[in-house]
Amino acid sequence: RNAETKMAWLMPVLFLPPIGALLYLNLRRRPRPRRRLKQLAEKFAGMECLYVKKDGHVGTEYAGDGFAASCAEYVAQATGLPPTDCYEFEYFPSGESYCERLLEELEKAEKYIFLEYFILRPGKFWNSVLDILKRKAGEGVDVRVIYDDIGSMLKVPDNYAAELEKQGVKCMCFNPFRPVLDLAQNNRTHRKIALIDGVTAFTGGINLSDEYINETHPFGHWKDTGIMVRGRAAQNFAAMFLQLWFLRAPDEDYTRYLSTGPKGDCSCLAFCDSPLDRQNVCEDLYLKIIY
């Protein structure tokens, strides 16, 4: 066990001996993931062949840069998401610019819209997005939303997923909270992903809530960033989203959402951590870069 874990247990054991010892004995083992999480993890393993190159050398896009190639190899092996490319990239220095561009791209959707966010909160930002989603769903666009139950708790009604379903938006509340002693409740999705037609993808640190675009100021002026990529890299974001959506529809054929598009001239390593496994891919990669 790593040093951080040991130190975290040392404090309650030393200062609250009876209680700390009992907690340690009961919780020291990593909890088995709930059945639904385990099923999705297994599905993810089975889906790897859809988007990982089979030659075993996924870092060839970074010929001449051994370090970048080794990073790409590690990410592909750990996540099943290969290095890819895009033909357009845009950086958003604020939530306001991110919001404006996201709304523009959502209006262009013709096939499908996938959204996965930690926080949904009714207000100017989310209401503007939702208006588009409902209209697009009425036009026949496949609209799907995943939000985290803990992240959105006390921000949306308990039955919010059902409410969105009635409005034509397919919705899944990830890992609903249950008031029991269950460490699987810590398995949350903090990802912020928007995917349009399998070509355009957004990500970053911005949730669908007004404080992120400074319409409200519960924590002062909010500064966060986001990006948009257009091209084959969007398929990696489709894979990320669908790994979680499998919880809702395990028998659906997802391969139609993972088709490749035109090759771009900009290399892109699009990957994520997952609430479904015990790998800390992002942390490991940062440490690899630092050291």
Language-model-derived ranges and their functions:
Residues R1-Y291:
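N-terminal localization/anchoring segments of enzymes in phospholipid and broader phosphate metabolism
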